[in-house]
Regions:
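Hydrophobic transmembrane alpha-helices and their immediate loop junctions
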Residues: 1-149
């Protein structure tokens, strides 16, 4: 099997998990805080199909891409400032925590085989990368929403 194809193949679960969890946490947080729009759009789910756009997913395999953004409305939050911050910050925090969990698992299980080690490496990498990417102060990243509040 071609090495670069294998790298792409083993990276796909990392992309799927990181992006799906990120958008799911945003949708769930917004819904819990009173905004039912993400729920009405079917985005309060861990089904990756609901969180990806086909072109954005393909771009992620090669350079940088995007998931399907969860649309939220602060109009329905009880405390708009605090709740907007929570909706912006929590997905990134969860990605960072997941990345650290997968990094620990990688350190523990990498000697069990190349494939499991590589898979855990990419699960850690994409979660941490998405967290770092979202703290960049560039629209439409999460950091810009935090700075706007």
């Amino acid at each position: 099997m071609n090495g670069s194809f294998l790298v792409i193949l083993l990276g796909i679960p990392g992309i799927l998990v990181a992006t799906t969890v990120h958008e799911f946490v945003r949708a769930l947080t917004s819904t819990v805080l009173g905004d039912n729009y993400p729920k009405s759009q079917g985005q309060v789910t861990l089904n990756p199909v609901k969180h990806f756009e086909p072109i954005g997913f393909l771009m992620m395999l090669y350079s940088g891409g995007w998931g399907k953004p969860v649309e939220t409305s602060a109009l329905y939050y009880k405390n708009r400032k605090r709740d907007t911050l929570l909706v912006a910050i929590l997905p990134t925090v969860v990605n960072l925590i997941l990345g650290l969990v997968f990094l620990f698992a990688y350190g523990t299980f990498r000697s069990k085989g190349y494939y499991i080690g590589t898979l855990l490496h990419y699960l850690a990498y994409y979660n941490v990368a998405l967290a770092v990417y979202n703290v960049l102060p560039v629209a439409p990243m999460d950091c810009t929403k935090v700075l706007a509040v």
